[in-house]
Design a protein with these regions (language model features):
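Aromatic- and carboxylate-enriched substrate-binding clefts and catalytic-loop regions
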Residues: 1-118
């Protein structure tokens, strides 16, 4: 959700309860050495609308509920490693920060797993 298509809208009333913030990626130096184009891709130039980490379970529960009600019984989860470049900004949306790299991926994976287990 946080990656290739710009994330969620930070201006949409439908997402307001999820407290999204526009977040700029911070690719590691070693990643930029092998993929320098990351400095000028759309996410780097414009940021990505990320959901407040405290609202991830709510987001995935809503999305999975909608998909299940529509008859979808499976999804492919892809691109999770793209979340490693996004740290939740200190103080954004009432957050006290959520780090980046593995902690951001872990938060998303745990929220997805909790959502589909219901």
């Amino acid at each position: 959700i946080g990656g290739y298509w710009g994330g969620v809208s930070t201006l949409s009333p439908q997402f307001a309860h999820l407290l999204p913030a526009q977040v700029q990626p911070t690719p590691t130096k070693s990643l930029l050495e092998v993929e320098p184009a990351l400095l000028w891709d759309a996410a780097s130039l414009f940021g990505v609308g990320n959901i407040n980490p405290g609202r991830l379970t709510e987001f995935y529960h809503g999305m999975h509920g909608y998909l299940a009600a529509s008859g979808v019984d499976g999804v492919k989860v892809d691109g999770q490693s793209g979340l490693t470049a996004f740290a939740w900004p200190e103080g954004a949306g009432g957050s006290t920060g959520h780090g980046g790299t593995s902690s951001m991926v872990r938060a998303h994976v745990h929220a997805m797993e909790a959502s589909v287990s219901e």
